[in-house]
Amino acid sequence: MTAATTAELVDFDDVVARYEPVMGMEVHVELSTATKMFCGCANRFGAEPNTLVCPVCLGLPGALPVLNEAAVESAIRIGLALNCEITPWGRFARKNYFYPDQPKNYQISQYDEPIAVDGYLDVPLEDGTTWRVEIERAHMEEDTGKLTHLGSDTGRIAGATTSLADYNRAGVPLIEIVTKPIEGAGARAPEIARAYVTALRQLMRALDVSDVRMDQGSMRCDSNVSLKPKGAKEFGTRTETKNVNSLRSVEVAVRYEMRRQAAVLDAGGTVTQETRHFHEDGYTSPGRSKETAQDYRYFPEPDLEPVAPSPELVERLRTTIPELPWLARKRIQDDWGVSDEVMRDLVNAGAVELVAATVDHGVSSEAARAWWGNFLVQKANEAGVELDELPISPAQVAAVVKLVDEGKLSNKLARQVVEGVLAGEGEPEQVMTDRGLALVRDDSVIQAAVDEALAANPDIVEKIRGGKVQAAGAIVGAVMKATKGSADAARVRELVLAACGQS
């Protein structure tokens, strides 16, 4: 199937009327440890290619791996947050395959003895209900390198004239979280897939184990989809759509595969068990035939001891598990007294935690929401970054709010102060001073500007004296322009009306 043949797809409502989708989600999360999984190389995104490598992560002869303790603790915390059983004995295994992004020609992973098993995540849906997704396992492994293919129209290896390998990512610690089959979702399957990945992403952020930047590959999702006729017990043949790199794409990929597979089955064909590539135009294309575990020839990793976390360690780490983000948001919503719609907008903007942190600095939630949910969202969109990537902190936003509350800044001038902070000019009060933005509080200075504006506009003065007090707005505007917005508009209006006998 390609984008050009979408007319051949079965209507989605028709699909769910006759077939039952079965999904399975495999999510890879890169851990934000200081170093890689089995060596001392820095774990950092965006470095020059092949500068964060060593004999261990390049798989050179004689180099031996040493397990990263912080990665193990992060894996245990993830397992606990997913309500998993932490196994008392976990073993690493070699997953053998040959591909240019794998310098050792095998990947150190976990096979039949993972660190966490049999969990679940209660996923919040848009209508306020939850859907329990059962977790089969969460296991540790190392990431592969990254390939860049040149000369191919698709950016993939097929048709490429040159392939470049960057091994900076090779050996970065990963947690792969695998669900049990998700059944019974029906027409909500695409929504539930997206909601699950969304919830997982929020959970990883709350745990502070990963930045889960899907655009940078620190969170990657593979969606498995199969169809079975309504009432059938046996699962259909599944496909696995690899490396879906946005929340919206997760939903689109599942929906597309359901429609595509239904078209294949309706035509009397057989769904091929294969991996598929997702295209941003909203369709999937064939990748390779899907391997089985036997194809990888797993065997125990001889250079690493088993992982045997003590009960004391597990219980200590259990105390570090935070409140689930969506439950925290519900509590915060009740505290703030905002509607579901307002809260949803804040969630979609990624502003909830930022607003909460700003409130913690002693300002009202209303003022904090106004900044993070409006002006700063616009600035983030203009810069093409996430809201929490803006170079301004909740403490700095709170400082701006306090300057307004203290009468030192107007809302209009406050926006200029925030722009100065974003530009790296310093703390809010310093920016206010350096830019000369503080409100003028001296009545004699304001009165002089008022007198000048009145003298320049005698016709407007006569209107005000005649009772048309709304005409005072023109004088107020002239004064604000003359003072470059640094006068208190309310005080200016009082002085104008008083001068015209309308106080």
UniProtKB/Swiss-Prot annotation:
Nucleotide-binding among keywords: yes
Domain of life of the source: Bacteria
Gene Ontology molecular functions: asparaginyl-tRNA synthase (glutamine-hydrolyzing) activity; ATP binding; glutaminyl-tRNA synthase (glutamine-hydrolyzing) activity
Catalytic activity: L-glutamyl-tRNA(Gln) + L-glutamine + ATP + H2O = L-glutaminyl-tRNA(Gln) + L-glutamate + ADP + phosphate + H(+); L-aspartyl-tRNA(Asn) + L-glutamine + ATP + H2O = L-asparaginyl-tRNA(Asn) + L-glutamate + ADP + phosphate + 2 H(+)
Enzyme Commission code(s) on record: 6.3.5.-
UniProt keyword annotations, A-Z: ATP-binding, Ligase, Nucleotide-binding, Protein biosynthesis
Gene Ontology biological-process annotations: glutaminyl-tRNAGln biosynthesis via transamidation; translation
Pfam family, one: GatB_N
Gene3D superfamilies (alphabetical): 1.10.10.410
Stored InterPro entries: Asn/Gln-tRNA_amidoTrfase_suB/E, Asn/Gln-tRNA_Trfase_suB/E_cat, Asn/Gln_amidotransferase, Asn/Gln_tRNA_amidoTrase-B-like, GatB, GatB_Yqey_C_2, Gln-tRNA_amidoTrfase_suB_CS, Gln_synth/guanido_kin_cat_dom
Keyword Nucleotide-binding among record annotations: yes
Family: Belongs to the GatB/GatE family. GatB subfamily.
Oligomer and partners: Heterotrimer of A, B and C subunits.
Protein function: Allows the formation of correctly charged Asn-tRNA(Asn) or Gln-tRNA(Gln) through the transamidation of misacylated Asp-tRNA(Asn) or Glu-tRNA(Gln) in organisms which lack either or both of asparaginyl-tRNA or glutaminyl-tRNA synthetases. The reaction takes place in the presence of glutamine and ATP through an activated phospho-Asp-tRNA(Asn) or phospho-Glu-tRNA(Gln).
The protein's name: Aspartyl/glutamyl-tRNA(Asn/Gln) amidotransferase subunit B
Organism of derivation: Mycolicibacterium smegmatis (strain ATCC 700084 / mc(2)155)
